[in-house]
């Protein structure tokens, strides 16, 4: 069953060469979201991985702005957990913590509400895609500053040639699909 589900998800990923710049192949997850069966398969595969790896040890899923918001709450619901949001800076009310990270051309910032988690709570970070690892690494930094334990980071797609997984170490990382 898992192989056919993974194939269903993989068949929905579209590739757009030279977008947004020459030499880049953009991996478009929009068709996965459009097709209920492939979206359900993606959530199911991620949930089964997390159950097998962590059992009942996970307290929360942390979804990253913005496409992690599409997968995070659905994954949390599938696992019977709550979901906390890690947003681009300036989007959350109340007291927040923030962290900067590097992009290909400049910097960006993420934030989380200071009361989003209690010290010692165990979290899995989810996003749609791992490229350089900057966003997930900043999220892990923020969660660490809240004294949460990051059990793992997961994504639908991983761009292996950008070595983002290495930036996350020692936090384990899992992806459903890998592309160069």
Swiss-Prot record:
The reaction(s) this protein catalyses: AMP + diphosphate = 5-phospho-alpha-D-ribose 1-diphosphate + adenine
Sequence positions bearing N6-acetyllysine: 114
- Which CDD domains does the protein's record reference? PRTases_typeI
What does the record give as EC number? 2.4.2.7
Which GO terms of the cellular component aspect does the record hold?
cytoplasm; cytosol; extracellular exosome; extracellular region; nucleoplasm; secretory granule lumen
A Pfam entry, by short name: Pribosyltran
| Modification N-acetylalanine, positions | 2
Pathway listed: Purine metabolism; AMP biosynthesis via salvage pathway; AMP from adenine: step 1/1
Residue positions of the PTM Phosphoserine?
A: 4, 15, 30, 66
Q: Where in the cell is it found?
A: Cytoplasm
Q: Name one GO molecular function term.
A: adenine phosphoribosyltransferase activity
Q: Which SUPFAM superfamilies does the record associate with it?
A: PRTase-like
Alphabetical UniProt keywords: Acetylation, Cytoplasm, Disease variant, Glycosyltransferase, Phosphoprotein, Purine salvage, Transferase
Q: Does the keyword Cytoplasm apply?
A: yes
Where are residues bearing Phosphothreonine located in the sequence? 135
Phosphotyrosine is found on 60
Q: Name one GO biological process term.
A: purine ribonucleoside salvage
Subunit comment: Homodimer.
Quote the function comment for this protein. Answer: Catalyzes a salvage reaction resulting in the formation of AMP, that is energically less costly than de novo synthesis.
Fetch the HAMAP family from UniProt: Aden_phosphoribosyltr (MF_00004)
Linked pathology is:
Adenine phosphoribosyltransferase deficiency: An enzymatic deficiency that can lead to urolithiasis and renal failure. Patients have 2,8-dihydroxyadenine (DHA) urinary stones.
Q: Which family does it belong to?
A: Belongs to the purine/pyrimidine phosphoribosyltransferase family.
The record's section on PANTHER family has: ADENINE PHOSPHORIBOSYLTRANSFERASE (PTHR32315:SF3)
Q: What is this protein called?
A: Adenine phosphoribosyltransferase
Q: Which gene encodes it?
A: APRT
